Amino acid sequence: MQLKKTQSEIKDIWKNREKFNDCNLKKTARIAIKEVIELLDSGKIRVAEKLSSGEWVVHKWIKQAILLHFLTEENKIIDNTNCWFDKIGNKFSEWNEEKFRRLKIRAVPGCFVRRSAYIGTNVVLMPSFINVGAYVDSGTMIDTWSTIGSCAQIGKNCHISGGVGIGGVLEPIQASPVIIEDNCFIGARSEVAEGVVVREGSVLGIGVFIGASTKIIDRETSKVFYGEVPPYSVVVPGSIPSKNNISTYCAVIVKKVDEKTRSKISINEILRD
């Protein structure tokens, strides 16, 4: 019941955001917005969630709350040995050793997680950047120099390899976030953006780029997909003939994940301890 009340408040505040010069409105708004940010931060709510049908629903009002958070906050010094100047603080700035141990989160020097991003248990964060409203589920590793964009949803037991870009989406507000479902492996220097959904158990090879308009072609059936990688697909970069003897980029599903593939990408439990 309280969540529905907060949702209604956020929607009303969003409609009246042009009136934020009114200090009283700004003060009232902060209470509701802070509640949403704390719920996001604890993982009790998320920007997108999977329905029993297998479809993903995006909660627009939560994205609105994140944007309103930027409107209501002032830039401030964020001092945590290093020094930054931003509206959104470091998720871990007030954490102590006991909390890290209890949640079994390993955060390597050089990683930065903005407040309102949720990090599940047994997650390993190498030097990487996790943006506002993102959701990183349990058992996942975010490898070096990877970026998880605003509101992106990363499933359980995923490996996001070095230098990967997972696109964010707070603008335009109606767009869906990138979703990487459970047990996926995203190869180094790959980029997934524009609301693409990578379904459970899929493997993207090194340097695969997928946006909403990228052709994803199944080599065996010649079927073309847009915006979604089917479950348990092994995907590599490719090209397809176009007009005037010019080839254009595409992503190619070369096979379904098999035991040989699984052995190459299996999680190293030693690194998760």
Curated annotation (Swiss-Prot):
Localization in the cell: Cytoplasm
Reactions the enzyme catalyzes: (S)-2,3,4,5-tetrahydrodipicolinate + succinyl-CoA + H2O = (S)-2-succinylamino-6-oxoheptanedioate + CoA
Origin superkingdom: Bacteria
Pathway: Amino-acid biosynthesis; L-lysine biosynthesis via DAP pathway; LL-2,6-diaminopimelate from (S)-tetrahydrodipicolinate (succinylase route): step 1/3
Record bears the keyword Secreted: no
Pfam families the record matches: Hexapep_2, THDPS_N_2
Amino-acid positions noted as binding substrate in the UniProt annotation, renumbered to this chain: 106, 143
GO CC annotation: cytoplasm
Biological process (GO), any one: lysine biosynthetic process via diaminopimelate
EC number: 2.3.1.117
MF terms (GO), sorted A to Z: 2,3,4,5-tetrahydropyridine-2,6-dicarboxylate N-succinyltransferase activity
Keywords recorded for this protein, A-Z: Acyltransferase, Amino-acid biosynthesis, Cytoplasm, Diaminopimelate biosynthesis, Lysine biosynthesis, Repeat, Transferase
Major site of localization recorded for this protein: cytoplasm
Subunit and partners: Homotrimer.
Family from the record: Belongs to the transferase hexapeptide repeat family.
PANTHER family in the record: 2,3,4,5-TETRAHYDROPYRIDINE-2,6-DICARBOXYLATE N-ACETYLTRANSFERASE, ACETYLTRANSFERASE
HAMAP family: DapD (MF_00811)
Record-given protein name: 2,3,4,5-tetrahydropyridine-2,6-dicarboxylate N-succinyltransferase
Organism the protein comes from: Wolbachia pipientis wMel
Gene: dapD
